[in-house]
Amino acid sequence: KIARAEVDGERLSDTEITAFCGLLFIAGGETTDKAIANMWWNLWQQPELFHHVTAHPQAWDNAFSETMRRTPAVVNEDRFTTRPVEWHGREIQAGTRVRISIGAANLDPTVFRDPLCFDPDRSDLHSGKELRSGASPEPGRAGHLGFGLGKHFCIGYELARTEAIVGSRQLVERCPNLRPAPGPATRPQIQGNSFQALLAFPLVFDPAH
């Protein structure tokens, strides 16, 4: 599809196609690993949750959705106004950079009950394949904004979800009794202007026999 894509009736050049593919690889590598680490960190804050998902592999799906709500890898996105706009009594000129906090929106108490609580089985969150609209086909449930919204929705969201879930299952299968290494605990931190991730999350496991 990329090779045949057109912009204003013209095909993309080889340079544009190469640059776009490079962006996909970089974007996926920079965010998916953080999402996986954040998910594992969240689960290990309540060890019974980690043991539950390892015993019931289908539960990884809900755990990933809740991670993308509670501690998404990307917490802020920048946009630029295309025209003057007034927002809550403040005039914003055209061409102004506006920072949108995905992380804050995902913690809106009017949308999610007890939003600071990590609960993979919460009844107010749409789990499973994300929707570009951010809505949910299920009454009473809302989608998280961890992958963005609308035309800015993450193009690689399905790959990211698959990598996180399949990768976690494989890691558990191949590393017996996988658990956090002894030592002081860390938590996901804001890095730069956009990312939320662990600085380190060492794990240990028993030798395979």
Identify the meaning behind each predicted range.
Residues K1-H209:
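Cytochrome P450
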